[in-house]
């Protein structure tokens, strides 16, 4: 995943937020302004204690950082990478899935990035939406909630099951809806004020595909 793709996708992603609810979108910039995000892996982004030769170090500090985590315990992707069990992969420690080093906490630990908005996308590939929906992954939801609570100075844009209607994700619509709701309710029940959840369709989806998951 390269930095240019991350910037382009996040500008589009944020634009969707603003147009979807221009009167009440949480963390929206003032009219006429946009937030630029950089990502999508630690090495490409830079600005952390371990990785210091990326976008942040060579171009400048963006308005936000884009990052991905997985709720997919024990699942193996097409590159032969098996995801961690017992924790949200890519959230509190560094890992890699054949797309660069991934560690969200590294950005939060960096004084350089102390004013950045955090975009956190959650993947539930490998039919993991079923386990989120039925409560089997409640320990992962708790880890996510604790993470957001522990960093109240940073706004989080949480994109649950991003591109949910894309064929590459193969999410079951009823279980996806339940999984999305379960994560949102946990964040709301914790009375956190530093997050907004994002319902993000894939760019090529038809209205009929979108409605299946709505």
Positions of the model-derived regions?
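Coiled-coil-like amphipathic alpha-helices with heptad-repeat character
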Residues: 14-17, 154
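Bacterial N-terminal signal peptides
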Residues: 7-15
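N-terminal carbohydrate-binding/catalytic regions of secreted carbohydrate-active enzymes
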Residues: 33-151
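Active-site cleft segment of glycoside hydrolase catalytic domains centered on the general acid/base Glu
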Residues: 130-214
């Amino acid at each position: 995943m390269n930095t240019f793709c991350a910037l382009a996708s996040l500008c589009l992603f944020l634009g969707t937020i603003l147009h979807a609810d221009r009167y009440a979108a949480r963390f929206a910039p003032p009219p006429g302004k946009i937030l630029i995000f950089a990502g999508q892996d630690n090495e490409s982004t830079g600005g952390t204690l371990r990785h210091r030769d990326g976008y942040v170090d060579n171009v400048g500090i963006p308005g936000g950082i884009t990052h991905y985590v997985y709720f997919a315990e024990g699942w193996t992707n097409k590159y032969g990478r098996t995801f961690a069990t017992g924790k949200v992969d890519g959230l509190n420690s560094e890992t890699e899935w054949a797309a660069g080093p991934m560690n969200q906490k590294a950005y939060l630990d960096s004084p350089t990035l102390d004013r950045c908005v955090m975009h956190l996308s959650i993947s539930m590939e490998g039919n993991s939406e079923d386990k989120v929906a039925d409560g089997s992954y409640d320990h992962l939801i708790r880890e996510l909630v604790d993470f957001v609570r522990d960093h109240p100075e940073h706004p989080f844009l949480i994109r649950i099951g991003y591109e949910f209607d894309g064929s590459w994700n193969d999410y079951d619509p009823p279980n996806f809806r339940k999984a999305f709701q379960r994560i949102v309710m946990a964040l709301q029940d914790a009375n956190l004020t530093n997050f907004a959840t994002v319902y993000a369709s894939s760019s090529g989806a038809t209205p009929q595909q979108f409605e299946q998951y709505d």
